[in-house]
Amino acid sequence: MIKKATLLTAFSVTAFSAWAQDTSPDTLVVTANRFQQPRSAVLAPVTIVTRQDIERWQSTSVNDVLRRLPGVDIAQSGGAGQNSSIFIRGTNSSHVLVLIDGVRLNLAGVSGSADLSQFPVSLVQRIEYIRGPRSAIYGSDAIGGVVNIITTRDNPGTELTAGWGSNSYQNYDISTQQQLGENTRATLIGDYEYTKGFDVVAKGGTGMQAQPDRDGFLSKTLYGALEHTFSDRWSGFVRGYGYDNRTDYDAYYSPGSPLIDTRKLYSQSWDAGLHFNGERIQSQLVSSYSHSKDYNYDPHYGRYDTSATLDEMKQYNVQWTNSVVVGHGNVGAGVDWQKQTTTPGTGYVPEGYDQRNTGVYLTGLQQLGDFTLEAAARSDDNSQFGRHGTWQTSAGWEFIEGYRFIASYGTSYKAPNLGQLYGYYGNPNLNPEKSKQWEGAFEGLTAGVSWRISGYRNDINDMIDYDDHLQKYYNEGKARIKGIEATANFDTGPLTHTVSYDYVDARNAITDTPLPRRSKQMAKYQLDWDVYDFDWGMTYQYLGSRYDSDYSAYPYRTVKMGGVSLWDLTVAYPVTSHLTVRGKIANLFDKDYETVYGYQTAGREYTLSGSYTF
């Protein structure tokens, strides 16, 4: 049972993502309602990934972390650094809100979608992943779910890591966290990653011209943070990070024209915050700035040639979030202000434009006996399309101790991005995409097995589609998504099991055809065990068949790509109390498959790494 005393205690401790840590036996979550609460009190399905999980899985990318989670389906045009899309519960990749330390990821500004193939996994200390609508709390984009990547580190000392692997993979990382006096803590991280990659274009009948090359990826990252405690009530932080990435890829081209097959991405982010932690009241003010420059070009001509394209975006954010303990729960309220600016000459937005958004939200959670009630409402005032309101409500009933029924309903929306509004084929009269979602779930603890079964429906209207004849974007699409999600985790002796199954029927509501690149069924299984100090891990994933389009001829045709079963194997061994060595075999049985038509994925890959702490 969710004890009232537990709730009251959790609501009165430090809140918000910059300070969120696993300090409670009942893990605390910030992202669900923008105030800290026990995970057991969150009515929406939530998954938490820690830095220890990432190291155990030996993940070399954020996509490799997310693909293991319930409801997540990733389509990628090749290997490391290649363009990728994240589908949560069948929604578009633009319907996933990605936050970095609670702040919207800047790279989604022009394209409208967050491509996490470019974000360094070395910076990720924790991920809080919420499924379902969250626009009533966060505003635009939070239709399918929210992924909050938290970079705040709480690991004093220094760690050196080096890794090597297939396709000339190399990774070198140094991170340190030191106390500067009694009340100040400093963190520094530097990371270098390189791989020659492989030829991502699939062989035979895809319509792509032969480009027999290796499509590699290079990333350099630097991160720094200062945290200071002024008193028992007040604390603050300053943080900055940047990365410089280069990706080689294969693209369509015309003989005699430049071949645009190289991407160069520069990204930097800075933020500062001040936090008040009272006995019953918490308040936080955060201001942030981010700037990204995304070039696509032919390396023979350079990124400043007239044939090159540039997407340049600046994003400014101010967030004021507050929460107060009320009764056996919490009430939260806050204001978000955001400004996105494009620079003249941006590839898809040739002139300079800016878009402002101010959002005001109110959330509440109460524990009334065996019932948990949750509600939220938000109003956004956007400089392009005016005001838009969203709301959601959920109720949980613990009808037997340890067993709970949950019902929820919520509205959400996706604002048109700057490319759709002001690009060469843009339409400044676009309206937001709108969603209505229902979900019912049972969850419980049976004989040591923690489980949850959910059924949901999502109706999305005014979807923004490109009209081939009019050569403009219009609000003319509709989608209907129905799904079932089941999750479970349990221990059997030294073995830890994590299981999930997803059935997703995502369809165009007008043509009744499947939405592209989504698997209809997914099954995922993670097994971890310790034997004589060896930490073993095995991952199994079944990805069902999916549909895509073959654009090699006009009119294009729909193609079906078959399902696949994938196995990964990992092992780690602590040679000493300071030195740990790790090894991994990904795609153990060397399966050949595609998640984007015409682009092959990696075959069997090996990695070996070691880390030394002091």
UniProtKB/Swiss-Prot annotation:
Domain spans labelled TBDR beta-barrel: 155-614
Entry's Gene Ontology molecular function annotations: ABC-type vitamin B12 transporter activity; metal ion binding; porin activity
Residues covered by the TBDR plug domain: 38-152
Keywords: Calcium, Cell outer membrane, Ion transport, Membrane, Metal-binding, Porin, Signal, TonB box, Transmembrane, Transmembrane beta strand, Transport
Leader sequence residues: 1-20
Membrane topology qualifier: Multi-pass membrane protein
Motif TonB C-terminal box, residue range(s) on this chain: 597-614
Stored CDD domains: ligand_gated_channel
UniProt xrefs under Pfam families: Plug (PF07715), TonB_dep_Rec_b-barrel (PF00593)
Keyword Signal assigned: yes
Binding site for cyanocob(III)alamin: 85, 92, 110-111, 251, 309, 517, 551
Transmembrane segments: 158-165, 169-178, 184-195, 217-227, 232-248, 263-277, 279-296, 309-325, 328-337, 353-369, 371-381, 385-400, 403-417, 434-443, 449-458, 473-490, 494-509, 517-529, 535-550, 558-572, 585-596, 602-614
Protein residues bound to Ca(2+) 1: 199, 211, 213, 215, 250
Motif (TonB box): 26-33
Subcellular location: Cell outer membrane
Xref: InterPro entries: B12_transptr_BtuB, Plug_dom, Plug_dom_sf, TonB-dep_rcpt-like, TonB-dep_rcpt_b-brl, TonB_box_CS, TonB_rcpt_b-brl_sf, TonB_rcpt_CS
Residues at which Ca(2+) 2 binds: 213, 215, 249-250, 261
GO biological process: cobalamin transport; monoatomic ion transport
Gene Ontology cellular component annotations, sorted alphabetically: cell outer membrane; pore complex
Recorded family membership: Belongs to the TonB-dependent receptor family. BtuB (TC 1.B.14.3.1) subfamily.
HAMAP family, A to Z: BtuB (MF_01531)
PANTHER family: COLICIN I RECEPTOR-RELATED (PTHR30069:SF53), TONB-DEPENDENT OUTER MEMBRANE RECEPTOR (PTHR30069)
Functional summary from the UniProt entry: Involved in the active translocation of vitamin B12 (cyanocobalamin) across the outer membrane to the periplasmic space. It derives its energy for transport by interacting with the trans-periplasmic membrane protein TonB.
Full protein name: Vitamin B12 transporter BtuB
Organism the protein comes from: Salmonella typhimurium (strain LT2 / SGSC1412 / ATCC 700720)
